[in-house]
Amino acid sequence: MEKIRLQKFFTDNKIMSRRSAERVIEAGNVKINGITAHLGDKVDPENDRVEYNGKVIRNNTSSKKYIMLNKPLGYVTTTSDEKGRDTVLSLVSDVGERVYPVGRLDMYSEGLLILTNDGELTNRLTHPKNNLPKVYSVIIRGEVSPDALHMLNSPMEIDGYKLKPVKVRVVSNTNGNTNTLFTLNEGRNRQKSETRPDSGWYRRSSGCRRKRNRKP
């Protein structure tokens, strides 16, 4: 969201007048993200943490939007694309509020993607310390042997970084294919491509949010 002057943040949220806001800022009673604010400072109302006398001021100037999108194949998970490819935002252009994707799905992966303008939720879902899992339905061509399943569940290393083990569970075998569930605790780039033995990916859940069989 576009940044605004700190005084305007106070007046927009009906906390105090502009002049009163200037006085409390000059007195050192206001902090932005834990740092004492000064006159002229600007804030992002959706993502910055503003405190007045030790109390967090919540932004109530815009409504929060939460979208659970069944992302189809062929869309990139960005707000814009320099190559001119279709982005996921083109699928929600009628929302009326600016939203952005939480995390990402590869262009040729499909399934649950959360879009929101809630910065706090985005941080909770994406910060590594929260260790929220992502579950994918993966169709593997052919049958998966016990040895292959053991290998898939073993730790791997990408670019010198040791990843947490992927949990893989066989759900069923259909028409010569193996239907599995992959649970990833890290979104490390290339982890899926290094893990999958020629398969299609469909993300069913992200953190505590589960996607059921919904159309895009």
Where do the protein language model's features map onto the residues?
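Basic, flexible Lys/Arg- and Gly-enriched helix-loop patches that mediate nucleic-acid binding at interfaces
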Residues: 1-216
